[in-house]
Design a protein with these regions (language model features):
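Loop/turn segments within WD40 beta-propeller blades
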Residues: 12-19, 58-65, 84-85, 103-126, ...
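WD40/WD-repeat beta-propeller blade N-cap
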Residues: 1-8, 47-54, 92-99, 105-106, ...
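Conserved strand-to-loop turn within each blade of WD40 beta-propeller repeats
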Residues: 24-28, 70-74, 131-136, 180-185, ...
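C-terminal interaction modules of eukaryotic adaptor/scaffold proteins
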Residues: 203-255
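WD40-repeat beta-propellers
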Residues: 11, 31-36, 57, 77-82, ...
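WD40/WD-repeat beta-propeller blade-loop signature
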Residues: 7-9, 18-21, 43, 53, ...
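Loop/turn-rich, solvent-exposed surfaces of beta-rich toroidal or solenoidal domains
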Residues: 161-194
Length: 255
């Protein structure tokens, strides 16, 4: 087994339709991609273009393909694509002070799952993700097939300290939800209606949840209606949207 030269911060599984593929990222600035073959794990790709710690990696939903996004302290985001047993990559600046997290959107736009589709070819699956940075901002990125690059479609501002984590809710129903966790001891839940242009920051509203400690991670349930929050107080709290649109803590798990 090959080894990283520093602490391993994150591991992430690709969708099983692409095989048994695992990615790892490290303080050493490298990303390894592994595949199980004949009962043995083999490193099939190494990405070395980041110049600082790779803090978080995330595979895209399977519909747009096999894409791995990585957030690095060097201020850049990379997207590695696995297609026809070959790898390609893109790397671009995202947050000048460092990128701490990345999270893919659902492959369907909000409302597509429940609305009637016109006859003909279905809409192309989305290749879109959110990043959180040490510049206190959340940024949204969308793949542009014309330029074959990722465009910054929106900047969400409101935190007053580093954004440690972002999580895009997997539900594509009637709204888009993004949760952001910050060193400012708050979580913001950003909401955009299905009918609105999510590339316009004014269409996003945020609900602020306040805590007594730094917040490290946020994670949505698979159904996208429960948010788990963990922070420096060694607690995990579960939050759910009420019928009135507020967010209530429904359970707290303590160490």
């Amino acid at each position: 087994m090959y080894r990283h030269d520093g602490a391993v911060w994150c591991v992430s599984w690709a969708h099983p339709k692409f095989g048994t593929i695992l990615a790892s990222s490290s303080y050493d600035g490298r990303i390894f991609i592994w595949r199980e073959q004949n009962g043995q794990w083999q490193r099939i790709y190494e990405f070395t273009l980041h110049t600082a710690s790779v803090n978080l990696i995330a595979w895209s939903p399977p519909e747009p393909g096999c894409h791995l996004a990585a957030a690095s302290s060097d201020g850049s985001v990379s997207v590695i694509t696995f297609l026809d047993n070959a790898f390609s990559h893109q790397i671009f600046p995202a947050h000048g002070l460092g990128v701490n997290s990345v999270s893919w959107s659902p492959s369907l736009a909000p409302g597509q799952l429940t609305s009637a589709q016109a006859p003909g070819s279905p809409p192309a699956p989305l290749r879109r993700f959110a990043t959180g940075g040490s510049d206190n901002q959340v940024k949204l990125w969308d793949y542009n097939p014309q330029t074959q690059s990722y465009d910054n479609m929106c900047v969400l501002s409101g935190h007053v300290d580093w954004v440690r984590d972002v999580a895009w809710s997997p539900t594509p129903l009637n709204k888009s939800y993004i949760a952001s966790a910050s060193q400012d001891k708050t979580v913001r839940i950003w909401t955009c209606p299905a009918s609105a242009d999510m590339g316009n920051a004014s269409n996003w509203t945020s609900t602020e949840l306040k805590f007594d400690a730094v917040i490290w991670r946020v994670s949505w349930s698979l159904s996208g209606n429960v948010l788990a929050v963990s922070g420096g107080d060694n607690r995990v709290s579960l939050w759910k949207e009420s019928l009135k649109g507020g967010w209530d803590c429904v359970k707290t798990i303590e160490e």
